[in-house]
Amino acid sequence: MEVSEERDLYLHSITAALERLNSAASECQSRLLSEHDGSIEDHSANQTAHDNLVQEAYKFLQIAQGPIDTVATCFERTAHVACARSLLEMGAFEGLPIGGESRSTKELAEDLSVDEALLARLMRNSALFEETGPNQYRHTPFSEAYLRPEIRAMFRFAMDEHMPAHLKMHEFLKSNSWTEPTSTSNNPYTYAHDTNGKSMWEYLSERPTRMASFNDGMTLQAMTELWMIDLFPWESLSDQQPTPTTVVAVDIGGGTGMGISRIRSYCCSLPGKFILQDQAHVIQSADPRGNGIEKMAYDFFEEQPIRGALTYLIRRCLHNWPQESIIQILKNVAAAMQPEKSRLLIEEIIVPDMNAGIEEGWMDMIMMNLGAKQRTLKEWEEVLALAGFEVRKIYQIPGNCHGLLEVWLK
């Protein structure tokens, strides 16, 4: 290709990408400036506009950089996260004052008892702090995010557990004859961490500090995705005429209770019981809010003790497991359900058949580390059928990858 042709192609590509970026930015700005009613549809429209803007920004940056520089960004991105993880461990984020005041690396290094030259290099190359003078830094909103406990935990978990698995993924897949990993004990994570045949869950259970990072980080996900509970018309359960002894909802693997508390608030006029189930160490710290909510230690690989509930829920759990394990979990629920009375609600990402978004993509690679996966609707229907279920309704906002599957016994 001639130089002039290459230049013209680049100019055309970057102009078109800029137009798409400006359009996405205008739509996002319009959503931000409009009045909001707090509905699920409103929330989803805001999120979709934001996601589209981010995606177009990524595309624009890729075109602006060109193919070779885009490949080279792997050095830049890994350097940034390496700096951030080191600064987190060092305690540098807490060492800077909040409120816009800057501080020298000399003062900060003395407080932290670290080498100033090392600290200065890490802060300079982290792309997080504002440089106000030679070796003078202050917080930005991006660095202050690391002061939030749930953000710190999520980042630590990503870097310490999944980054090694990502970097060793090609080695594992080659040793696995380039086939999809489907085992909890033989996957990129167990390979990278040399777990000696233990799954990530078993391995982390022996390392409480690292398991705590996972649990604390998941509270962020639980808070940001609570809105999916709102997709189901909870008031419709009154049609089944529950009594004070009826179990209205069982939240299986429901964590600390935010989900079941929200469900109870939507069913405030209904009598009956609401059950929060999770492993014993999680249930101990659970604090659900609402009348009639009971806590129960339970492992979903065991027989489900609550029989004939109106609604069972499994929220954001099944994607962590390979198909064989999912079928076992689902069959335990199925055995407890009463035909044409009990339903199971499954809250998960539903990967679109085409043009999957950023979140679905990186989440699927996280799951590959564990021998699990994110699934399309067809794939969910297939695995559910193997456990004796059929999908009767899908609750999903257009443009959003998260959905709620309402499934019944076949």
Curated annotation (Swiss-Prot):
Positions contributing to S-adenosyl-L-methionine binding: 253-254, 278, 299-300, 315
Name of the top EC class for this enzyme: transferase
Pathway the protein takes part in: Secondary metabolite biosynthesis
Family matches, as PROSITE patterns: SAM_OMT_II
Transmembrane helix recorded as keyword: no
Biological processes annotated in GO: methylation; secondary metabolite biosynthetic process
Its EC number(s): 2.1.1.-
Keywords for the protein's UniProt record, in alphabetical order: Methyltransferase, S-adenosyl-L-methionine, Transferase
GO terms for MF: O-methyltransferase activity
Pfam families associated with the record: Methyltransf_2
Active site: 319
Effect of disrupting the coding gene: Fails to produce aflavarin.
Induction: Expression is induced by the developmental and secondary metabolism regulator veA.
Domain of life according to the entry: Eukaryota
Task performed by this protein: O-methyltransferase; part of the gene cluster that mediates the biosynthesis of aflavarin, a bicoumarin that exhibits anti-insectan activity against the fungivorous beetle C.hemipterus.
Family that this chain belongs to: Belongs to the class I-like SAM-binding methyltransferase superfamily. Cation-independent O-methyltransferase family. COMT subfamily.
Protein name in UniProt: O-methyltransferase afvC
Protein's gene: afvC
